Swiss-Prot record:
PANTHER family per UniProt: RIBOSOME-RELEASING FACTOR 2, MITOCHONDRIAL, TRANSLATION ELONGATION FACTOR G-RELATED
Gene name in the database record: fusA
GO terms under cellular component: cytoplasm
Record's subcellular location: Cytoplasm
Family assignment from sequence similarity: Belongs to the TRAFAC class translation factor GTPase superfamily. Classic translation factor GTPase family. EF-G/EF-2 subfamily.
Main location: cytoplasm
Keywords: Cytoplasm, Elongation factor, GTP-binding, Nucleotide-binding, Protein biosynthesis
Functional description taken from the UniProt entry: Catalyzes the GTP-dependent ribosomal translocation step during translation elongation. During this step, the ribosome changes from the pre-translocational (PRE) to the post-translocational (POST) state as the newly formed A-site-bound peptidyl-tRNA and P-site-bound deacylated tRNA move to the P and E sites, respectively. Catalyzes the coordinated movement of the two tRNA molecules, the mRNA and conformational changes in the ribosome.
The protein's name: Elongation factor G
Length: 700
């Protein structure tokens, strides 16, 4: 089979935004205008095509990033047909892992902002992730029809809050109820959409007289941005010559791909205005797979390798999402970076060093699927029934193994105990949790050794609620959940030297003997978390026992002496000890090390660390006093507030343990008008009274 769409005409894009900026509605409109779905799905009535898990439709938020393929030839059919793979990413902070993971496999992103709310807390998180993976982006200011909409304010916020060099491609004609259309600053024409056919058709018209001056001024800004792309464009521009439409677009494209500017469009997805022009911007300015640098990887001999976006290179792909589908079982979404895969081929999972046979391959359109025979470089598809592929694994040709970059996943901050309501469900619950953990690396399951309880951990209350909910719906397991547990940590504040640990049992027969002397010292919280320094001189402890000392200490780190929480940010220096020719063993040195560590830890001014969350509350001005008062009762440190006439943003740092049930309390204080987001910020020392209470409770 030959390629149906040349790789230059592919666009792999993510659509990401803050909750409620209207991202799913925007994705829906893309599917509608590109001719894939014939009925518009509205999030309000729970029928949006992209939000396909039942809970997403109930809660009206997007949880799983569905990948969908759509085709586009431009508003005026001005391009050959392009193929756009759209990845819809969640905007809720508990699902940041999904966003991070999809950023890995995207080439470009559309950032959706609300014309009223502007750049909101989650927008900043998503922006940082896009920077981390150097993803070129365009912005779409949505909800221009809402009261309080202000396009230029959002353009300004992209500069001041995110540090993005925003360049408007359009200006809105009217706003709020009078929002009629947009002026295209490249063509210098007004675009009006036809409301009778849901905006499928539109007309180019003259710019309204009262907008001509503003449009001239902003066009100047646009042309200048384009001219900065190259010396020849700059010379032409400074020489007073007009740049052609092609030159302006080429200049802007070059600068977007270099990450220097963010073109901004506007519209109202709900009112069917502006989405097609935004799709044109995706084709004009966002990269094809061939425009981005080759993906780097690691060859089997640990040297660096790379794969270019070409069908002729060996096959390589990254599995970026595992989803459980009620009809076909496991769906593994993957992005092909190089080469071609056909159904029936066997490939290597180079991370686990196992072979996998590709059976059926499907291309997803939200939750409908079309079976295909092959997938080529630059494309995204899903495979059915792969046996042992996890998120972030590399799939590659058996004769050309490579491991593409590994993804890094955050540590969970909150845990709850779960137990099935009936004994019969015990095994089913284990299976269900295992399957869900395979799909979502930011979710962990383990059994508490002391209590025997099953503990699930994740990125926030909502994250765990949804896991329990999915167990009920998809696996028919009813479970009771305990009170949330916070992941505390233990560390030390002062250095202690020359603490010894001795394990000796020498009463006839083969004895046990190990003896170590260590120093214990604090490490910087930004550092490695733990280090072990061996400074044994003259063989007072033989080399083969040194790893046992390290191991003995590390086993103690899992459950600290204060309250049984993990120990972090300390170093151990082993500098003296003794051994016995016959009685010494690895086990004896391991035990000696653990005794020395416990003794040293208790002398080194041990403290309990608690997770601190970065919390941002947005509230109408009337409730600011109540909200701040309540935050102070939760031991918050309020760092400041920003206000406009509609909303006040309060930034605070709050211990996670004080944030349980906050959503409900905030709703009742503000009659449901405030919202908040939180993300893990750091660990900090817990005040003595708090620490004492926690340690006391753990002893019971």
């Amino acid at each position: 089979m030959a390629r149906t769409t040349p790789i230059e005409r592919y666009r792999n894009i993510g659509i990401s935004a803050h909750i409620d900026a209207g991202k799913t509605t925007t994705s829906e409109r893309i599917l509608f205008y590109t001719g894939v779905s014939h009925k518009l799905g509205e999030v309000h009535d729970g029928a949006a095509t992209m939000d396909w898990m039942e809970q997403e439709q109930e809660r009206g938020i997007t949880i799983t990033s569905a990948a969908t393929t759509a085709f586009w030839s431009g508003m005026s059919k001005q391009y050959p047909q392009h193929r756009i793979n759209v990845i819809d990413t969640p905007g809720h902070v508990d699902f940041t892992i999904e966003v991070e993971r999809s950023m890995r496999v995207l080439d470009g992103a559309v950032m959706v902002y609300c014309a009223v709310g502007g750049v909101q807390p989650q927008s900043e998180t998503v922006w940082r992730q896009a920077n981390k993976y150097q993803v070129p982006r365009v912005a779409f200011v949505n909800k221009m029809d809402r009261t309080g909409a202000n396009f230029l304010r959002v353009v300004e916020q992209i500069k001041t809050r995110l540090g993005g060099n925003s360049v408007p491609l359009q200006l809105p004609i009217g706003s709020e109820d009078n929002f009629k259309g947009v002026v295209d600053l490249v063509k210098m024409k007004a675009i009006n959409w036809n409301e009778a056919d849901q905006g499928m058709t539109f007309t180019y018209e003259e710019i309204p007289a009262d907008m001509v001056d503003a449009c001239e001024e902003w066009r100047q800004n646009l042309v200048e941005s384009a001219a900065e792309a190259s010396e020849e464009l700059m010379e032409k521009y400074l020489g007073g010559e007009e740049l052609t439409e092609e030159e302006i677009k080429a200049g802007l494209r070059q600068r977007v791909l270099a990450g220097e500017i963010i073109p901004v469009c506007c519209g109202s997805a709900f009112k069917n205005k502006g989405v097609q022009a935004m799709l044109d911007a995706v084709i004009d300015y966002l990269p094809a797979p061939t425009d981005i640098p080759a993906i780097k990887g690691i060859n089997p001999d640990e040297t660096e390798g790379e794969r270019h976006a070409s069908d002729d290179e060996p096959f390589s792909a990254l599995a970026f999402k595992i989803a459980t589908d009620p009809f076909v079982g496991n769906l593994t979404f993957f992005r092909v970076y190089s080469g071609v895969i056909n159904s029936g081929d066997t490939v290597l999972n180079s991370v686990k060093d196992k072979r996998e046979r590709f059976g059926r391959i499907v291309q997803m359109h939200a939750n409908k699927r079309e079976e295909i025979k092959e997938v080529r470089a630059g494309d995204i598809a899903a495979a059915i029934g792969l046996k042992d592929v996890g998120t972030g694994d590399t799939l590659c040709a058996q004769d050309a193994p490579i491991i593409l970059e590994r993804m890094e996943f955050p540590e969970p901050v909150i845990s709850v105990a779960v137990e099935p309501k009936t004994k019969a469900d015990q095994e089913k619950m284990g299976l269900a949790l295992g399957r869900l953990a395979q799909e979502d690396p930011s979710f962990r399951v383990h059994t508490d050794e002391e209590s025997g309880e099953t503990i699930i951990s994740g990125m926030g209350e909502l994250h765990l609620d949804i896991i329990v909910d999915r167990m009920r719906r998809e696996f028919k397991v009813e479970a009771n959940i305990g009170k949330p547990q916070v992941s505390y940590r233990e560390t030390i504040r002062t250095r202690v030297n020359d603490v010894e640990g001795k394990h000796a049992k020498q009463s006839g027969g083969r004895g046990q003997y190990g003896h170590v002397v260590i120093d214990l010292y604090p490490l910087d919280p930004e550092g490695p978390g733990y280090e072990f320094v061996n400074e044994i001189k003259g063989g007072v402890i033989p080399g083969e026992y040194i790893p046992a000392v390290d191991k003995g200490v590390q086993e103690q780190l899992k459950s600290g002496p204060l309250a049984g929480y993990p120990v972090v940010d300390l170093g151990v220096r082993l500098h003296f000890g003794s051994y016995h020719d016959v009685d010494s063993s690895e086990l004896a040195f391991k035990l000696a090390a653990s005794l020395a560590f416990k003794a040293a830890f208790n002398k080194a001014n041990p403290v309990l660390l608690e997770p601190i969350m970065k919390v941002e509350v947005e509230t109408p001005p009337d409730y600011v006093g109540d909200v701040i008062g309540d935050l102070s009762r939760r031991r918050a440190m309020v760092n400041g507030q920003e206000a406009n006439e509609f909303v006040v943003k309060i930034n605070a740092e709050v211990p996670l343990s004080e944030m349980f049930g906050y959503a409900t309390d905030l709703r009742s204080q503000t009659q449901g008008r405030a919202s908040y987001s939180m993300e893990p910020l750091k660990y900090a020392e817990a005040p003595k009274n708090v620490a004492d209470a926690i340690i006391e409770a753990r002893k019971k």
